[in-house]
Structure formats: structure tokens, C-alpha cells
Amino acid sequence: MGVDIRHNKDRKVRRKEPKSQDIYLRLLVKLYRFLARRTNSTFNQVVLKRLFMSRTNRPPLSLSRMIRKMKLPGRENKTAVVVGTITDDVRILEVPKLKVCALRVSSRARSRILKAGGKILTFDQLALESPKGRGTVLLSGPRKGREVYRHFGKAPGTPHSHTKPYVRSKGRKFERARGRRASRGYKN
């Protein structure tokens, strides 16, 4: 008698809809589902996929990073599209005129973009303006920017590991003995 095929790993794990029950997000999903199906543009498919993503996979994009990315050659007069939040950066003094589209824009970032003569679109306005994503630049925030990523990687204490250990506090008595001081065994 043959062994039956194992079906336990058959399922493809990817989101087919957003986890959130936010009705406005669901409406955007409806709109971009239609656009992704009816247009042959990859832009709409990428936006749809990103609308499904979790909060940690939609990290906020700072104003400074957006300005830096939009200054690159060939990106003049294009719309910056962010499936996520745009936040303010106080380190930036001059904000150029920008045209942006995002799910959310923090209040200070909003006032600074508009003060510079820029324009802020929502995704439904973007769908009317460029249904195929023409004249847009898709941007996203740094996914590995969260503090938790510092704890990932090679175990702390092993050679060439720069992983942050989970320590109660950073005092003299905490993870400062063997392997950290030459007087206590060895130091690496």
C-alpha cells in the first residue's frame, strides 16, 4: 500500500485581504482589486498587495527620506506614492514642492508639505489621476528600522555577532563577565 501524499504543506501563505476591518481601507481594496484586474499595470497589483500588509510591513516614511528619494534624477514632477504613513522630520529645514499620495500623513508633515505649495492625494484621487500608475514613484519606509530587528541574527556573545541581547538593565553586573573582560576568562 502506497503512502498517501502529505497535504499539510500545500497551502500558500499570503494575504488575500487585509486583516483590518476598516471600511475605508476595504473600499480602497475594492477599487484597486478592480484596477489590478482590469488594467495590465504592475503598479496596481503592487499597491493592492501592500494594502493587505500588516502594520509592521508598512513602516512609516519620514519626510526627509521621501525628499531624498524624490531628488534622484528623473523623478522631477512625479507623484510619490506611499502605502503607509508619511511622518514629519524636524531635522529638515526646507521642504521642496512635492506631490504625494499616502494612506495617512501626520498633521505636521501635512502642514509642511502644503505650506511648500505641495499637494497631498488620497488613493482614490490617485486612481482617477493615474489609473495605471503613470508618473508615480512607489516608495516605502525602512522595514528593518524597528528596534526589535537589533535582537535578531547571530546569538549575542558569539564571535562577530552584533546582536543586541535582551538584558534587564545595562549595569556593571549585567552581561559584563566571561567573554566581555580579559580578567574573566577571555574577551572576544
Curated annotation (Swiss-Prot):
Residues 161-171, 178-188 have a biased composition (Basic residues). It holds the Pfam family Ribosomal_L18. Its main location: cytoplasm. SUPFAM superfamilies: Ribosomal proteins L15p and L18e. The modification Phosphothreonine is found at T158. The modification Phosphoserine is found at S130. Component of the large ribosomal subunit. Belongs to the eukaryotic ribosomal protein eL18 family. This is Large ribosomal subunit protein eL18.
